[in-house]
A protein has these predicted regions:
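Soluble "head" domains of membrane/secretory-pathway proteins
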Residues: 2-31, 38-39, 45-69, 94-95, ...
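Transmembrane alpha-helices and immediately adjacent membrane-cytoplasm interface residues
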Residues: 66-95, 116
Length: 280
């Protein structure tokens, strides 16, 4: 089951803020008036630690005290509102659950996603309210895929609107040009061999990627639609991406993955910061 945390956070912020606001407008004034009446009934209550002050405090708690729900709303609303703003418009943390982006990202990596790199969007509705930039080839991007529109995915931008993307014999072509590949190592992995290399998309400094010899990849050629992006995982033979479920609409973009800040694979392991750093 996918938990829509942004929706829950928005509901909690609006609920706590609404309770605090309604209390301030409708009920808080009555409690203040009652406390003033009680102050007249306890002369000397302004003297700290006096009997009158203690009796006055007890009476206020009993007859003019702030309801618990209002107290909680007043305490939590500012904190939750700050969290909502940070997660919605600045940076949001995510955990990597699969190996589709190996070797760039490993299972258990905790990453930060820049939420304003491609424009500011309202939480839940995903409506863009301010243009700031657009995805570029080579960006590692978080988004909602067309076949699971409530699940976060992370892949690399391979094609922009209008690009022709081809894949033949595990070789990538962009706009008819062969994407340079430099193979760095071959590593045995059980019954197959993993080839790790570096790939240089047009206009980028290159990134790590890997394939294996278990099976042949399906050849294809496609033109990226207007307002869409073609996404692929760096673990080319172990990634469900645009080759399977199609292109990603601009409206379903979440943000740009910019850094790893921690690695923690499971509750049985020890958190590590050795992989902390920028995402290439």
């Amino acid at each position: 089951m996918n938990i829509d945390f942004p929706l829950i956070l928005v509901i909690v912020v609006l609920g706590s803020g609404g309770i605090w606001l309604l209390d301030s407008l409708l009920l808080a004034g009555g409690r203040r008036a009652r406390r003033e009446q009680l102050a007249q009934a306890f002369p000397g209550c302004d003297q700290k630690d006096s009997r009158a002050a203690i009796a006055y405090a007890e009476a206020c708690d009993k007859e003019a005290g702030e309801p618990a729900v209002v107290e909680y709303a007043r305490s939590f609303f500012p904190v939750l509102a700050v969290v909502l703003v940070l997660r919605s418009f600045l940076y949001e943390p995510f955990q990597i659950p699969s190996s589709s982006m190996v070797p760039t990202l490993e299972v258990g990596d905790y990453i930060l996603v820049n939420k304003y790199a491609y424009g500011l969007r309202l939480p839940v509705s995903r409506t863009k309210v301010f243009e700031l930039g657009e995805p570029e080839r080579g960006d590692v991007m978080v988004f909602f895929p067309p076949h699971q529109n409530n699940t976060y995915y992370i892949k690399r931008v391979i094609g922009k609107p209008g690009d022709q993307i081809s894949y033949r014999a595990k070789q990538l072509f962009v706009n008819g040009e062969k994407v340079p590949q430099e193979w760095l190592a071959e590593l045995p992995s059980g019954r197959f061999t993993v080839k790790m290399g570096r790939e240089e998309l047009p206009g980028t400094d290159g990134h790590l990627m890997q394939t294996d010899d278990r099976r042949g990849a399906r050849n294809f050629s496609v033109v990226v639609q207007p307002g869409h992006y073609f996404m692929m995982g760096d673990n080319r033979d172990n990634s469900s991406d645009s080759r399977v479920w199609g292109q990603v609409p601009e409206r379903d973009i979440v943000g740009k993955a910019v850094s790893i800040w921690m690695h923690w694979e499971s509750w049985l392991s020890v958190p590590s910061f050795k992989r902390a750093g920028a995402i290439d």
